[in-house]
Amino acid sequence: QLQQDVQNDDRKQELLRLAGKYNVYIVEDDIAADFDTNSRNDPLFYYDSSDKVIYIKSFSKVLMPGLRVCALILPDLIKNTFLEYKEWTDTYTSILSQGSLAVYLGSGMFDKYQDSIRRLYMNRMGVLQETVRENPAPGLEWNIPDSGFFACVKLKKDTPFDKIQPMLFKNNIRLMDTSKFFLKEFRNNHYYRVSVSKANEDEIRAGIPKLIRILGRYN
């Protein structure tokens, strides 16, 4: 599964080459497209000339998780098989949700909302970048995008999540154990994901210095 906004063009081309070589499909879950500030950052599907990409565009992040509606582009070879399975596993797709979304998209309201939500998260990430610059810490390597929900901080030392979790909770900081994101044979404890989805700009300014100090103790 590939979140497209973390991949550069060369990486995309290499992934497509490997998909063709080994005759496998790539599922591209384009959940962050609505937050992307780079209009030239095309999805992997854009480069696919061999029908190896299954492209999914969800509205759960930009609108609401409970909407449960997405757009899907499938390679011709597996369309009929997919529709057959969908018929038996998803017999009650909400007509109301689909109709409401269609009206919302067609009216132009979504475009206005998309612009406002993109600015909101651009501002939050900008504050995060600024706060990190103002609180330098040796051994911490940050990857902060220009917009979106998530940033990443890497520690030099392998630091199990359960080791720092009590101190995080004590300071009202909630992080996810990102070791679960890795295949078992590649699992490590160097990376921590930071989300700004539920934190406003003031909370980011107050919380990030605390996080940096805590991580610094274990690094």
Language model segments and positions:
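PLP-dependent class I/II
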Residues: 1-219
